[in-house]
A protein has these predicted regions:
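Extended extracellular/luminal ectodomain segments enriched in beta-structured repeat modules
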Residues: 22-26
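Periplasmic OmpA-like peptidoglycan-binding domain that tethers envelope proteins to the cell wall
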Residues: 9, 30-109
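Short, solvent-exposed loop/linker segments at the N-terminal edge
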Residues: 3-6
Length: 109
């Protein structure tokens, strides 16, 4: 699924507020999946999730040139839950995430 969940909207609102406060701030947005589907599907899904997050932020008035969005599929798992490993739903959820990295932290004063 690549829609924005209500709990994710709260986090995206925080990002928007920070980007409004610091108009020169640029971010890289990286979306990740768990390992339960085929690698190619997960790559596509994470790309759609990244695009959805970026589009949501842009709809709030942030210039799209300030955001780079990229999907990583299941290439950067945060735990042992790779292909064929039996894990709980909570463990898989940890891998389904979007991370934000500030590209130019020097603009935050």
């Amino acid at each position: 699924k690549s829609y924005i969940r209500p709990d994710a909207e709260l986090e995206l609102e925080r990002v928007v507020r920070i980007m409004q406060k610091y108009p020169e701030l640029k971010i890289n947005l990286g979306s990740h999946t768990d390992s339960r589907a085929r690698d190619a599907y997960n790559w596509s899904l994470s790309t759609r999730r990244a695009r959805s997050s970026k589009n949501w932020i842009v709809r709030q008035g942030i210039d799209p040139s300030r955001i780079k969005a990229e999907g990583f599929g299941e290439t950067e798992l945060v735990n042992k839950c790779s292909n064929g490993v039996n894990c709980s739903e909570d463990d898989h959820q940890l891998n389904r995430r979007t991370e934000f990295v500030i590209v130019n932290p020097e603009v935050i004063k």
